[in-house]
């Protein structure tokens, strides 16, 4: 459905930025369980301070880009990083274009 729109929208984000974000998503998914386990150890007050400190050091040695906070929400169509609706994963501009083309059911241009 959206592959037709890519040709019509001129302003695409740089492919390097999109690829960098995709790499971060893959890294985050790969290290998710390991990071979660280490954070659980760090937050556990019943463990000794030494064990918690070792877990903190292991966590800091993991790649920075494996942290979920480093991922940027981007538009799936244009790659635009700002003005992205989380549920739709589409930027406000792409959403407007799709709506005007009649590709989103029930969405019409308002008039009053």
Residue ranges and their predicted role:
Residues 2-85, 97, 104-112:
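Intrinsically disordered, Lys/Arg-rich N-terminal extensions and targeting peptides
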């Amino acid at each position: 459905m959206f592959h037709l729109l890519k040709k019509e929208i001129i302003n695409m984000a740089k492919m390097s930025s999109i690829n960098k974000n995709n790499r971060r998503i893959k890294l985050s998914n790969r290290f998710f369980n390991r990071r979660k386990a280490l954070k659980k150890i760090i937050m556990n007050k019943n463990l000794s301070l030494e064990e918690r400190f070792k877990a903190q050091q292991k966590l800091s040695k993991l790649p920075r880009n494996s942290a979920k906070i480093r991922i940027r929400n981007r538009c799936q169509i244009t790659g635009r990083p700002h003005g992205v609706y989380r549920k739709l994963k589409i930027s406000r501009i792409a959403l407007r274009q799709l709506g005007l083309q009649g590709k989103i059911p029930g969405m019409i241009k308002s008039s009053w």
